[in-house]
A protein has these predicted regions:
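Subset of Sec-pathway N-terminal targeting signals
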Residues: 1-27
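Short pre-active-site segment immediately N-terminal to the catalytic Zn-binding motif
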Residues: 189-207
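Auxiliary, metal-adjacent structural segments of Zn-dependent hydrolase domains
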Residues: 138-185
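Active-site recognition of the HExxH zinc-binding catalytic motif
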Residues: 203-219
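Propeptide-to-catalytic entry region of secreted or membrane-anchored zinc metalloproteases
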Residues: 28-157, 193, 201, 299, ...
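Active-site-proximal beta-strand/loop segments in catalytic clefts of secreted hydrolases
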Residues: 50-55, 165-171, 199-201, 216-217, ...
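Loop/turn elements at helix/coil->beta-strand transitions in domains of secreted/extracellular proteins
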Residues: 43-48, 158-163, 190-193, 217, ...
Length: 333
């Protein structure tokens, strides 16, 4: 067998070993505490979908295999809207939802029929859920649900996590909670807590409520105000219906209502101020949103090793974080 000619040792190809793949977000976001479960809408988001099943004589609604699957499909569609909208905004960032549907496939028992009560009765059945999953404590519902969401974040290996409660309204006359409560239909507790929606609401509602989870404000009349501020940049709610600026006209937005909301949903757009509240702001127009577009340094030295034929670099890297200006939440950077 002929011998291959030996390569001339005076000439070597430079060999570069690739570093392991990195994403802009690759773990629990830097600086986030256990209660920081939804600071900006980027990366991987854990979603726990919960259905409650009333027991005994109070029951007027019953989940079926078909209705459960319909809910799962609608929720996925509503959240997919945000993925598609981000894709139109940026080619750099990613957004993925990781679902835990175990509490939807096997609805959680409750002593009340949620849709037949006022919306404020959520205190009863959300506490029953927290007890069911062994997450109920002497703390508030807000704290307990955030701790639960944090445990789900760890279990699902995501950056953020929140919970959705979908209420069965199939047999309800108007698909609304009983009169006398704070809300008639869907409502949310912002900053990585949870939202509640009757099953009969459209997919756009599920997209709208997710905006609240990541700090966006309502923009329709009687809800959010133009002087409200929230989100990582503490952005102002400029697209609110009550903006007094001369000549102001509301633009289509997922956080509005009526045709402004439905048109925004159809076009995969939202108001600039609502997008800023969820973290989607690119001040220098370089394609990277401000929250992740932060100064970084790389220092080190390198040399070619003639024995191994490899170039070896030894150094260190450091990165700063953008201050969290949110006037709500935990204020962790």
């Amino acid at each position: 067998m002929p011998m291959m000619p030996r390569a001339d040792s005076r000439f070597r190809f430079l060999h570069v070993e690739a570093l392991e793949p990195r994403q802009l977000l690759s773990s629990t976001p830097w600086g986030a505490g256990s209660l920081d479960t939804a600071e900006y809408l980027l990366g991987d988001v854990g979603v726990t979908l919960v259905l409650m099943e009333s027991q005994g004589s109070v029951s007027s609604e019953d989940w079926t295999t078909e209705s459960i699957e319909a809910v799962k499909t609608k929720v996925a569609e509503g959240l997919q809207w945000w993925k598609d909208t981000l894709a139109a905004q940026s080619s750099v960032h990613s957004l993925n939802f990781v679902f835990d549907t175990s509490y939807a496939d096997n609805p959680v028992p409750t002593t009340v029929e949620p849709i037949a009560r006022t919306s404020n009765t959520y205190v009863t059945w959300v506490n029953e859920f927290l007890t069911y999953v062994q997450a109920n404590s002497s703390e508030t519902i807000s704290t307990d649900i955030r701790h639960f969401n944090d445990s789900q974040r760890q279990a699902l290996s995501t950056h953020w996590a929140f919970t959705i409660f979908v209420v069965n309204d199939e047999n309800d006359a108007d698909g609304q909670f009983a009169a006398g409560g704070s809300f008639s239909r869907a409502f949310a507790f912002p900053g990585g807590q949870f939202y509640v929606a009757p099953a009969g609401r459209p997919a756009a509602t599920f997209a709208h409520e997710l905006g609240h989870i990541f700090w966006a404000r309502d923009e329709y009349s009687g809800a959010g105000s133009y002087d409200d501020q929230r989100g990582y940049y503490d952005a102002q709610n400029w697209n609110a219906a009550n903006n007094p600026t001369a000549g102001f006209e509301q633009v289509d937005s997922i956080m509005a209502s009526g045709t402004l909301m439905t048109d925004a949903y159809a076009q995969h757009i939202s108001s600039p101020s609502s997008l800023e509240m969820i973290g989607w702001r690119d001040t220098d127009q370089d394609g990277v949103f401000d929250v992740l577009d932060v100064p970084h340094q790389l220092q080190g030295t390198g040399a070619f090793d003639p024995v191994t034929g490899k170039y070896r670099f030894v150094g260190s890297a450091s990165v700063q974080s953008l201050p969290n200006l949110n006037s709500s939440g935990q204020h962790n950077d």
